Amino acid sequence: MNPQATDPIDDSASTESAVSRKAKAKPGQRRMEILQAFAAMLEQPMAERVTTAALAKRLGVSEAALYRQFASKAQMLDALITFTEDSLLGLAAKVGEPGADGVDGRAACGQIVWLALQFAQANPGMVRVLVGDALVFEQARLTERVALLFEKLEAVLRAHWRHWASQQGLATPTADAQVRAALLLIYLRGVLHAFVRSDWKQLPTQGADAHLEALLG
């Protein structure tokens, strides 16, 4: 999401400038401001659980103002997960369709994981969502959504590797693809956890070239 500094949402009508900003702000812009602030709070080292009260305070608005844009905190997290899923699967799609002409499945797997690592490095707040830190004490379905996201990403890796293994004439391309995709996902998730646990000091892309070369064989 690359949260950037934005003018806070102003829920007060006490000044003319506040009223002017409020009048100009569109619902979509307000929702984005809220999500950017949420992500920025998640980026803080040793970040505590983000509450709607803390989020409202950061934005300089009332909690009621937040709930006019999102029905619940869970809905905000849903939006962050959607952003992350669209981004990761979108990046994977840019590598090319599995089995498409000119697409090297083995190389594609490495590129997809590399792009995911780059995304994580640029969006540390989203990494807290992916590793589950931001979902502690939240609705179980949110954790299930993240699990499904990883399943989708693994399926893309599996498809790429299966096509490559078939082209190489390997005896068990499907089984090989299952193992390789699982290993790549384990690596990716491990790197994300290390990024969080190090308070963003252990960068996801650090040493990734050598790691991926070893994993891809």
What is each PLM-predicted segment?
Residues 31, 47-49, 64, 73-74:
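A short, glycine- and basic residue-enriched loop/turn
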Residues 17-21, 49-51, 59, 73:
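Short glycine/proline-centered loop/turn elements that form peptide/ligand docking sites
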Residues 41-50, 70:
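Short helix/strand-capping hinge loops at secondary-structure junctions
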Residues 1-29, 96, 168:
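N-terminal intrinsically disordered/low-complexity leader segments
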Residues 120-144, 193:
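Amphipathic alpha-helical segments used for helix-helix packing
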Residues 2, 127, 143, 147, ...:
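Hydrophobic/aromatic-rich alpha-helical bundle segments in the mid-to-C-terminal region
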Residues 60-70:
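Short hydrophobic/aromatic patch on the recognition helix
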Residues 29-40, 44, 54-58, 75-98, ...:
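Alpha-helical structural segments
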